[in-house]
Amino acid sequence: MAKRYEELTIEDDFMFGKVMEDRELCREVLECLLEGPVGKLEDVQTQREFRYTSDGKPIRLDVYTRDRKRIYDAEMQRLNHQSPEKLELPRRSRFYQSSMDMDHLSKGKSYRELPEGRVLFICTFDPFGLGYAKYSFQNLCTEDKKLYLDDGTEKIFYNCTCDAEDVPDDLRELYEYIRTGKVGGDLTRRIDLAVERARRNEAWRSEYMKELLHDEDVREEGRAEGRAEGIKGTIRICKDFGLSFEETINRIREMFQLSENEVREDMKLYW
């Protein structure tokens, strides 16, 4: 069941994206994750969609940004009632990196000009089950582990369940904030303030509602049997966002192509 807007936290990708639209805060979060300096960010794009052919599968990156040296993709990842294996994070990280490279090359630049790339998955679970605070991957030679390909890419998976003592303080505080909402140092305090501001942003509330309604519509297209559940979910979303009884009827008629009488019968059950 989808959360109400005021229930969203930093671990929800919609809220994560809105908080990271603040360039300076985004830069500081990246520095915390990478444990090193990040340059001034040129742009921060959230829910950036890539589609390279008209019939190709599109992808959306939670947070896509760059400085003078690198391009970054930061993803907030929950299990969503799936196993880590079903999420296929390793292959997704490969796909995301290639998409960022193609975006760069599509602007007429040579592969020699490809910037370094960092794909970061901030996981609310242990993605590989070994207990490490993070898992960092670079390409290296199978025959000689000291020989790196040096292609400029790195994929890092963060385990927010880890609270080991050897984790840097600011990263441990970030993990704890993502897990529990507890504010620690200055960075998590600023993130928490940004979350509170976002919850009061009516334009973002409306945007979130539209996304939920769109998702309900997409699910409805693929499940005739589940029409009742789709209508029920849509009614709940409309109520949560303050739509009136009649406004909700009009919304459902439009989405599900039903008569007014049919919708009113459903409203008797679920309103």
What are these regions (language model features)?
Residues 1-154, 164-166:
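Accessory alpha/beta interaction modules
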Residues 2-6, 10, 14, 33, ...:
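Short, charged alpha-helical interaction segments and adjacent helix-coil junctions
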